[in-house]
From Swiss-Prot:
GO terms for molecular function: 2 iron, 2 sulfur cluster binding; 4 iron, 4 sulfur cluster binding; iron ion binding. GO terms for cellular component: cytosol. Iron-sulfur cluster binds at C40, C104, C106. Required for insertion of 4Fe-4S clusters for at least IspG. The keyword Cell wall biogenesis/degradation does not apply. Pfam families: Fe-S_biosyn (PF01521). Its cofactor is iron-sulfur cluster. One of its GO terms (biological process) is iron-sulfur cluster assembly. This is Iron-sulfur cluster insertion protein ErpA. Coiled coil: none annotated.
Amino acid sequence: MSEELPIKFTDAAADRVKQLIDEEENPELKLRVYVTGGGCSGFQYGFTFDEKANPGDLEIVKNGVMLVVDPMSLQYLVDGEVDYTEGLEGARFFVTNPHATTTCGCGSSFTI
């Protein structure tokens, strides 16, 4: 029986993280997803690389790479999906959040 994770980490996102980590030649890097106040809708998503997971962080391993989320951000990301896309608007990581009642045009800020 598999344990249901509170956030989905897509293959596309994990594969891109792996490529970026390989380019940096630092296998300790993890993708950290976080939520901060700001943006045009009240909250905004952030993505950064971190060499460590902090106590209490959610850790999701996929395709040999780790996604980490702090407990405060996790409450805003439950049932969401971290994905990666490349298109006419450029390449970016993004979050699909079913609990967001409003999102801005670029998709990086939201309201719950």
